[in-house]
A protein has these predicted regions:
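Cationic, low-complexity basic patches in intrinsically disordered or flexible, solvent-exposed regions
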Residues: 4
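Short, low-complexity, intrinsically disordered N-terminal modules
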Residues: 9-10
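TRNA-binding/sensing appendages of the translation machinery
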Residues: 13-79, 306
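A translation/RNA-centric and nucleic-acid-associated enzymatic feature enriched
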Residues: 28-29, 48, 64-97, 106-133, ...
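Short amphipathic alpha-helical segments with heptad-repeat character
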Residues: 39-43, 47, 131, 138, ...
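Short amphipathic C-terminal alpha-helix that caps PH/PH-like domains
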Residues: 141-151
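Alpha-helical scaffold segments that mediate packing/assembly in large oligomeric complexes
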Residues: 155-192
Length: 332
């Protein structure tokens, strides 16, 4: 069983520097040495993530990091590299594998996004994505519960952990809160009012997110169709998309869809996203034609992206993603 990381490693290295006649000031090398416990837990976490998915008959895959055409998304900017781009997500390639007949896939990989930096954001970060055919977003809620309970139980021997003064319980049931209910409960307005006033993101971040996942994880589900991204809309109510985000301790950890598999609808959404890029003064990406073509052969599926750095940050009670990676960008 692994204990929560403490300061023992830092103390040992500080003593070693003193014994060698070195000044034990907090240099970059000393700070890096002090991350040993957390980096060890990070390595164990990656091992157990892979174990979890292999036991559930998922195939681990690797797809190219350097791609010709990312998915156009108005609020996500890809890093250009020559005439190609570093992936913002492995999503498009993994869905092409689903279309080729692979039933269950997962991948742990590096992703890159331009101008993303903060206590919860890195321009280069680790993503876990997994996909299952003939499943929907409700299935992925159950998978998330099973994964996090397995990781916490394996690492710490209990389904509970402390984060920044809060105790977060992972035993079921987890909260399932619709976006509409969340806006009315915490935002003081409806989703339609927020969209009409162009304040959806502002209200979500400032009023709603701080209240999510504070004592137990929260699934925020059924986003408005305007924010469907690559998710399909609900058959019973096309105004809503079968999409959820998972929150722990007020932090968004994962984003999941019942996948859109209609190539015409996806092409229309990409065209709209490209127009938004142009309106914002950005150069649109090349057209992801091979992905659009593959959608016609893709079975009904569900997929999810989970931020590994944030997961490590939560499970080790760290305030910033900088504390759970060996080299934040400013230290290079």
């Amino acid at each position: 069983m692994t204990e929560h990381p403490g300061t023992g490693t830092v103390g040992r290295f500080k003593k070693n520097f003193s014994d060698c006649g070195m000044d034990p000031h907090p240099s970059e090398t000393w700070k890096l040495a002090g991350k040993r416990d957390i980096l060890r837990i990070r390595g164990e976490l990656l091992h157990f993530i892979r174990l979890f998915f292999r036991e559930r008959h998922y195939l681990e895959v690797e797809t190219p990091v350097l791609i010709p055409a990312p998915a156009p998304e108005p609020h996500i900017d890809a890093v250009a590299c020559g005439d190609r781009y570093l992936q913002t997500s492995p999503e498009l390639c993994m869905k092409r594998l689903l279309a080729a007949g692979y039933p269950r896939l997962f991948q742990v990989c590096r992703c890159f996004r331009e101008a993303e930096r903060g206590s919860r954001h890195l321009p280069e970060f680790t993503m876990l994505e997994w996909y299952a055919v003939e499943r929907d977003y409700l299935f992925l809620m159950d998978e998330c519960e099973a994964l996090l309970r397995f990781l916490s139980g394996t690492l710490y021997g209990k389904e509970e952990f402390a984060y920044q003064g809060r105790s977060i319980r992972l035993s079921p049931p987890w909260e399932r809160l619709s976006v509409e209910d969340a806006f009315r409960m915490y935002g003081g307005l409806s989703v339609r009012e927020a969209l009409a006033e162009d304040c959806f993101d502002e209200v979500l971040v400032s009023r709603i997110e701080p209240n999510l996942g504070t004592e137990r994880p929260t699934f925020l589900y059924d986003y408005p169709a305007e924010l469907a991204s690559l998710a399909r809309t609900k058959e019973a109510d096309p105004r809503l998309a079968e999409r959820f985000e998972l929150y722990l301790g007020g932090i968004e950890l994962a984003n999941a869809f019942s996948e859109l598999i209609d190539p015409r609808e996806q092409a229309l959404r990409f065209e709209e996203a490209q127009q938004q890029q142009i309106a914002s003064g950005k150069r649109p990406y090349p057209w992801p034609g091979r992905f659009i073509e593959a959608l016609s052969a893709m079975p009904p599926s569900a997929g999810i992206a989970l931020g590994v750095d944030r997961l490590v940050m939560l499970l080790t009670n760290q305030a910033s993603v900088d504390d759970v990676v060996a080299f934040p960008p400013e230290t290079l």
